[in-house]
Amino acid sequence: MEPVIELDEVSKTYKMDEVEVPVLKDINLKIAKKDFVSIMGPSGSGKSTLLQMIGALDRPTAGKVLIDGMDLSKLSEVEIARTRGKKIGFVFQTFNLYPTLNALGNVELPMIIMEKNKSERKKKAMELLGLVGLKERADHLPSQMSGGERQRIAIARALANDPSFILADEPTGNLDSKSGSDIMNIFVKLNKEGRTVVVVTHDKNIASHSKHIVQIKDGRIVGGKK
């Protein structure tokens, strides 16, 4: 099966004053359509930076990233942003919800950015809230919800533009074990429906939900398993 995400000899180095800090080194990775991959490794190993490369949130210092066969190095910043908006949904450990918007408003936001009409986006947002079991919380602010509920809102928001890929960075890191398990069950369901899911985690129990595990250490892929 042809990969839908491919990293070819990807390296990333950050400059801090006069010091160069290599974070990723010669990463080669292929992720197939409908795969569910967990990226594991110790703190500071480069997991989150790798996810940023996969999600086109940052550009590599060397090598190339391809999404659906498109070489991102050949795209402008505007084209990359458009690709992200259409193809990729992000879920973060800290939820990143707008505190002054209710659940419905937070889920609608990506559709506003993509200039979808008001009636269409409200209907879609309510459907997505139903998908994550929070339709009755549509009018509630993030401050009125538990951590698990806020993460489910974040997942609904990530699905707003019907992305092919869901990328999640430590999505259960701030949750209790029950809420974390509920979140992973949503990812499993989304994967079974045909979406490609990539999760960064340090938790073996969370990674056990995935089809493949990629191990990273000191900026290099050091192993993986099914």
Label every model-predicted segment.
Residues 213-226:
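H-loop (His-switch) and adjacent beta-strand-loop-beta switch element
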